[in-house]
């Protein structure tokens, strides 16, 4: 798994070629396996649980026994402790002390999309359609209007990045490749997940 790559296959996911020309937060892009080796801990485990990249730093500090509390530096600015981090240590999960540390995860493509993923559902909120709102639901992408259009199965360098007209809701239990948008069939679930997403982003104070 790497950053600059495109999904392989025969197009069975139905979302076109991706790379950097489309802000798709679909499963084939955001579901990234995490491999860890921690000296002194038994290996060979496969754990099915939600984690995020922000969990890496607290995990490493925990493994090095460097967890610490915030304090006053004595120079007029605070020294932040590990409890101030957005992430959580994965060691309790690795040791089998807990079954999960998160009920959901979020993903996104700067200025274009946010998504929230639970065990059963995946909700995608497309941002550019809300570009007139100056809040966390929108961020302009400079130069996007000058980019040239392209077909779904091409990936022209510098192509205009467009998003769907409405948000997406997928049932992860029955729709592995996220091809059947059920947002009109389950509007209550969509509203619930969008609310969870907004609350979480608001807590992060993220733009």
Predicted region positions:
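Short beta-strand segments
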Residues: 1-2, 35-36, 104-109, 124-125
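Generic structural signal for small/hydrophobic residues in well-ordered secondary structure
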Residues: 3, 33-34, 56, 90, ...
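Short, P/G- and charge-enriched loop/turn segments at secondary-structure junctions
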Residues: 17-25, 101-103, 152-158
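Short, solvent-exposed loop/helix junctions and linker helices
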Residues: 29, 47-54, 84, 163-166, ...
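Histidine-centered active-site microenvironments of extracellular/periplasmic hydrolases
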Residues: 1-42, 47-52
């Amino acid at each position: 798994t790497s950053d600059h790559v495109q999904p392989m296959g025969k197009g069975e996911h139905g979302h076109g070629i991706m790379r950097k020309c489309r802000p798709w937060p679909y499963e084939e892009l955001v579901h990234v396996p995490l491999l860890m080796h921690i000296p002194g801990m038994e290996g060979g485990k496969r754990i099915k649980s939600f984690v995020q990249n922000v969990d890496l730093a607290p995990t490493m500090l925990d493994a090095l026994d460097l967890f610490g509390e915030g304090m006053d530096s004595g120079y007029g600015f605070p020294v932040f402790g590990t409890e101030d981090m957005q992430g959580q240590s994965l060691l309790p999960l690795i040791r089998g002390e807990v079954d999960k540390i998160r009920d959901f995860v979020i993903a996104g493509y700067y200025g274009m999309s946010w998504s929230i993923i639970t065990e059963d559902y995946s909700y995608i909120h497309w941002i550019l359609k809300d570009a007139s709102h100056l809040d966390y639901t929108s961020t302009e992408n400079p130069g996007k209007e000058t980019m040239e259009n392209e077909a779904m199965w091409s990936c022209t360098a510098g192509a205009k990045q467009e998003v769907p007209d409405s948000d997406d809701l997928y049932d992860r239990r029955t729709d592995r490749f996220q091809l059947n948008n059920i947002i009109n069939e389950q509007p209550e679930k969509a509203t619930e997940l969008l609310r969870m997403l907004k609350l979480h982003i608001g807590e992060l104070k993220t733009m």
